[in-house]
């Protein structure tokens, strides 16, 4: 068969495969949005959830999801930055570095439910944090740390070596070169990775069932005592997130309009995850143009 004809056939096959993937993804998104959007209202987004009566909302669960996301990022971003900088800038090739990379690969391949059980045994039981936001945040840190570390490392390695050489040629210390030259250059990629990880954290459920709990106690918005279980800023209270709420309503829910609540909650969750994903790309492009004057 003629080479040009083979090339056209191969191109058509590849386009068809890509089209099928896009069609499946678009169908899934449209199905969730079409089922859920009609049930979303302001009262649904801000109201309290109901255990037995119809008409409950997702206000507390939505707040818990964002609060848990913030706490997780506060813990995981510095750790991933430090690990990524070490691997990209300071680690020498050898058995120790290879062992660290192997550990990162193993952690990144663990199922979230296994990480959840690990978090339950260590943070909930052993450290006696109980079902709490801090237990969930620590478990999600273990879950996302490998991905975020690799993102930081890859972003730093994409910075051209001439940038480092220029800093060292000016007599700047190595750590100052990393902080003032390399990291600003790699910042768009790092920020994009963090925002994408935020979407993954926001939609996680399995790991949180065993660590953050499955209940959402009423919050006293005038109580700013961080140790109180009714305080909205307490990290030692149980916190059912939106993803866990969807799972609970579908598996154990007793409310009469469980299907409606689940559909609306799934649509809200999907919308925020899409915002994180598209926002990461826009923010990365903006920072790249801003910092590189491109």
Model-derived regions: residue spans:
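Transmembrane alpha-helical segments of polytopic membrane transport and secretion proteins
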Residues: 1-18, 281-294
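Periplasmic/extracellular loop-to-transmembrane helix junction in inner-membrane transport proteins
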Residues: 1-13, 32-74, 93, 248-259
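Interhelical loop and adjacent transmembrane-helix boundary motif
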Residues: 52, 208-269
């Amino acid at each position: 068969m003629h080479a040009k004809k083979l090339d056209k056939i191969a191109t058509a096959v590849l386009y068809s495969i890509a089209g099928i993937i896009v069609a499946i993804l678009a169908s899934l998104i449209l199905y969730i949005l079409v089922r859920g959007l009609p049930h979303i209202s302001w009262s649904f987004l801000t109201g309290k959830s109901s255990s037995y009566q119809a008409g409950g909302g997702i206000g507390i669960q939505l707040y818990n999801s964002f609060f848990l996301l913030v706490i997780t990022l506060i813990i995981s971003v510095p750790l991933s930055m430090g690990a990524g900088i070490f691997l990209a800038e300071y680690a020498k090739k050898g058995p120790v570095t290879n062992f660290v990379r192997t550990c990162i690969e193993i952690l990144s391949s663990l199922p979230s439910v296994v990480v959840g059980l690990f978090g339950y045994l260590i943070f909930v039981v052993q450290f006696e944090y109980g079902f709490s936001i801090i237990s969930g945040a620590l478990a999600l840190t273990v879950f996302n740390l490998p991905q975020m570390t690799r993102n930081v490392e890859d972003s730093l390695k994409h910075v051209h070596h001439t940038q480092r050489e220029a800093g060292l040629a000016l007599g700047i210390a190595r750590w100052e070169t990393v902080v003032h030259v390399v990291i600003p250059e790699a910042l768009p990629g790092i920020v994009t990775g963090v925002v994408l990880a935020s979407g993954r954290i926001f939609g996680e459920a399995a790991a949180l069932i065993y660590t953050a709990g499955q209940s959402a106690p009423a919050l006293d918005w005038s109580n700013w005592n961080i140790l109180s279980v009714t305080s909205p800023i307490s990290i030692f209270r149980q916190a059912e997130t939106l993803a866990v709420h969807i799972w609970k309503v579908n598996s154990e829910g007793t409310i009469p309009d469980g299907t409606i609540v689940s559909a609306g909650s799934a649509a809200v969750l999907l919308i925020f995850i899409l915002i994180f994903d598209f926002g990461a790309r826009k923010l990365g492009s903006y920072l790249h143009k801003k910092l590189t004057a491109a």
